[in-house]
Amino acid sequence: MSQHLVPEAKNGLSKFKNEVAAEMGVPFSDYNGDLSSKQCGSVGGEMVKRMVEQYEKGI
């Protein structure tokens, strides 16, 4: 099981993941065993892209 650097961020990241997945049309749920690696990776990649953009706006 992975350890979160900031445990308090877990719920926020889950909500963010679900929002991004919904926008992309990827049906995320508590069980995602039926999703392809490509689908999961595209959601994660989009999350990172948006987080980097937000960070750069704050610089």
Swiss-Prot record:
One of its GO terms (molecular function) is double-stranded DNA binding. Keywords: DNA-binding, Sporulation. SASP are degraded in the first minutes of spore germination and provide amino acids for both new protein synthesis and metabolism. It comes from the Bacteria. PROSITE patterns: SASP_1 (PS00304), SASP_2 (PS00684). The record marks E19, V20 as: Cleavage. The keyword DNA-binding applies. GO terms for biological process: DNA topological change; sporulation resulting in formation of a cellular spore. The keyword RNA-binding does not apply. Gene3D superfamilies: Small, acid-soluble spore protein, alpha/beta type-like. Transmembrane segments: none annotated. SASP are bound to spore DNA. They are double-stranded DNA-binding proteins that cause DNA to change to an a-like conformation. They protect the DNA backbone from chemical and enzymatic cleavage and are thus involved in dormant spore's high resistance to UV light. Belongs to the alpha/beta-type SASP family. This is Small, acid-soluble spore protein C1. It comes from Clostridium perfringens (strain 13 / Type A). The gene is sspC1.
